[in-house]
Amino acid sequence: MSMDSVISSRSGADYRSFRQITRDRLLFEMLRSTKKSSKSAWKVLIMDKLTVKIMSFSCKMADVMEEGVSLVEDLYMRRQPLPLMDAIYFIQPTKENIRIFMSDMSGKIPLYKKAYVFFSSPVQRELVAQIKKDSNVRARIGALSEMNLEYFAIDSQGFTTDHDKALEELFSENAEGSLKYNSCLNMMATRIATVFASMREFPRVHYRVARTIDASTLTTLRDLAPTKLAAGVWNCLARFKAMIPEFPQTETCELLIVDRSIDQIAPIIHEWTYDAMCHDLLCMDGNKYVQQVPSKSGSGTENKEVLLEDHDPIWLELRHVHIANASERLHEKMTNFVSKNKAAQLHQARNGGDLSTKELQKMVQALPQYSDQIDKLALHVEIAGKLNSTIKEQQLKDVGQLEQDLVFGDAGTKELINFFRTHLDISRENKLRLLMVYAAINPDKTRSDKGAKLMQLAGLSADDMIAVSNMRCLCGHDSKKSSAGGFTLKFDLRKKRHGIRKERIGEESKWMLSRFYPILEELIEKLSKGELPKDEYHYLNDPSPSFRGIPSASTQTSPAHQPAQSMRSRRTGGTWARPRDSDDGYSSDSVLKHTSSNSRKLGQRLFVFVIGGATRSELCAAHKLSSKLKREIILGSSSLDDPPQFITKLKMLSTDDLTLDDLQI
């Protein structure tokens, strides 16, 4: 059962999830609302470069056409005049966009009969006055409204603000005094606020404070990013509170703002869930995967683009499970399909043995009535096969084992050196990621001669070491002055080896290499229980007496909410291909799947925003914890980065001459 179906129990049948609300606003509040006064049966929808992405992340073209849109146009392209049709403009409220709009609708013969204008974020008064000043344009406007929806709904529980360069603009060596710093944060704040405008939610705003060690330590702009962003979001919310009808006047949810410095490991380490591995190891463009299918002519193969999205039930089931678990489930699905289908059995008997991906694809032609079912099964069998081959070819089990041993303190410098000496055929990219994990745990060791020797031993270039060196930009201050503990990546001086994760009681590894968890998961649980460290996390607004953000006592006392305790590794107990009975919450067989529509109502929503890019492991944690905590958890970020993207961005933090294209790894 999906989160969307489970959360409908929160407040009855009218409850809608984050993505559903976003979609409904675009289709019904914007497109459908124009039908009341428009005499045009079909309309033109005009969008700019940003709003077309906003729309595409939430709606299909068929959805848009169903609301009376026959043509979608680019605001910046030369367009054919359609003076007998009405137009819907969904655009950002910029001077250039408004200039183009007014040019379209002014003069004796405008491009369109009537215009319905919807701005994605608040529009400046002077720009509205400019529109109203032109009597010809004013007479042709059917609606002029602020949609306040300026974010990408990338997932049923995730969004980004489309700030792909946030890491560079906010954390680079040149961020201090840069005009881009304030511009980036201001726009980010506005877009985050539009999430709450869409959801009609008013949050209690928590944020990570600057990590000042003592009065002599200079607080940098990097350290102040969460504080400044929290203030910016609050200012926007204050405006919405006064201007938007039915906007809550008291707190209805919680928002936590952090930055990428809380966890430098999560964007680098190899994740073993199906979704994370697809985006890490396969050459995908966003969610697009290129599948090889039999050509229509019958000879050879051809490429077919497919989207790994929510409409695919197999993807929904597998995306957050371990790759070994996913492979087992796919094998079971194939076996079940064949056992229940006589035609498939005959096809298998003719070919002999198990069905391969190609044989499944041929079966689509032989059994057209099952084409959709077999198509999706063949797709994921092919993907899982590629992933397992890559894992074997790149020796990723060995790489992943050392990564996690370093993180949990079961390995150190000696083991890393030995690995580099004995695994000479490991790829440069994987050696770099190993060294970056080591650097996050032992920052001082990689800045000394030892770091240069490790680089030489691993066969890394000076260009690779830029990424390792630039991790210091996310540390805030000199790690030598850091105190141990907390959520920051400071090594613990009390340990012989510097493990920066604790094993958690009650969450024993179900699969080999599944011990790792992002720090954000721990933070969300602490926030839900009201246990965020007060010296590290402040809030802007005191909660009103009616605020019910903290879950009920019954939730707090459940075994799943016991505090984490340090313990030795149980890594030898994990298994690559055989599950244990423990439930880690990631599986579709978790509590989420078995929650009935009559279950206890969910608590208030919890939003988390990560400045500088979120990871797929963090998005996975949002889904997992929504089930565990009985609250819809929505993860937002400036971008969603896979390891190669993050490493490329890290390299940009200390250079002026290189571009992203120059530094792709």
Swiss-Prot record:
Q: Which UniProt keywords apply?
A: Protein transport, Transport
Per the UniProt entry, what is one GO biological process? vesicle docking involved in exocytosis
- Annotated S-S bridges: none
- Could you say which residues form the signal peptide? none
A single GO cellular-component term from the record reads:
secretory granule
Picking any one GO molecular function of the record gives: syntaxin binding
List compositional bias (Polar residues) regions by residue number: 552-567, 585-594
Q: Does the keyword Transport apply?
A: yes
Pfam family example for this protein? Sec1
Using the UniProt annotation, give all residue ranges assigned to the region (Disordered).
543-594
Q: What does this protein do?
A: Involved in the vesicle trafficking. Binds syntaxins.
Matching entries from PANTHER family are given as: VESICLE PROTEIN SORTING-ASSOCIATED
The text of the family note is: Belongs to the STXBP/unc-18/SEC1 family.
Q: What name does UniProt use for this protein? A: Probable protein transport Sec1a
